[in-house]
Amino acid sequence: MSRRFKPSALVGSIAAMLLGIWTGLALSGPDAERSVPAAVRGDRNPADSAWSAGDRAYHFGFKKSRNGEPASIDQEGFGPLLERYGAVFRGSPEGRNLYLTFDNGYENGYTAKILDVLKEKGVPACFFVTGHYVRTEPELLKRMVREGHLIGNHSWSHPDFSKLSDEKIREELDRVKREVADITGQKDMRYLRPPRGIFSERSLRVSRDLGYTNVFWSIAYKDWDTSAQRGARYAYENVVSQLHPGAIILLHSVSKDNAEALGAIIDEARRQGYTFRSLDHLMSPLPELPM
């Protein structure tokens, strides 16, 4: 690179980047009864003429399922907003369908095993990928598509969409879509998982206008911290205890626990009468045919 940086500036940049990554992962990995604090306003100054209600930042959170009852966002305050822009966090409670999704920010050596399990069990999934993943893991992307899975958009650089201009949001999404298409041949990309779980009315509108459905989740746990893995049994119990009809399951592919527990999770869900479906089924459900 031709531009040279002062060491102090470089250290500051690295620290800021790491803080941003940590914050993003924290917000993507809920571990409490409510996954994150209720909706909060972004750090824009309301006195700034550029600020508007459409820039208010929401951090996705939900009340976890208990005893098979559907997870809820009623207490979060953003339910009507998601409905207005066609976003989803779970499917219909009618029928016993589950939708398996993975967030792939970077590769930690477990995605191949996850794909092996999905292939063995005949389960479809959607993998939400970032620009880093696209650039570093082209062969895994090809395998995902070849084996019938969907690749969704998790943005190019994992930013807070509520702080980006409309143009920057479009650039973030278009670049992922374009490069995934170049690598895999998947021309259509319809599903978006907002990076860090942060969104605004404006980001919902901009992404909807680009043809995306924002896909949140109704099952998750703190699985993203690779330094605090607690074993396959822990992963299994956290997911199975939250199962409910129509659930969208969020797992992070960096988790060793998830990779080791996935087969048992699928088997137990099926034992309870659940069927794993593609997100395409959620958005365009086929009529149930008589046996």
Region annotations inferred by a language model:
Residues 2-100, 107-114, 120, 274-291:
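N-terminal pre-catalytic segment of deacetylase/amide-hydrolase enzymes
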Residues 61-162, 168, 172-181, 188-189, ...:
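Active-site beta->alpha N-cap acidic-glycine motif
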Residues 98-101, 125-129, 150-153, 190-194, ...:
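Structural recognition of the beta-strand scaffold that forms the well-ordered cores
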Residues 105, 130-132, 156, 195-197, ...:
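Active-site beta-loop-alpha junctions enriched in small/polar residues
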Residues 110, 159-184, 198-245, 258-260:
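Alpha-helical scaffold elements lining the catalytic groove of polysaccharide deacetylases
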Residues 113-116, 139-140, 203-206, 261-265:
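A short acidic, amphipathic alpha-helical/loop segment
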Residues 243-280:
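Catalytic grooves of carbohydrate-active enzymes
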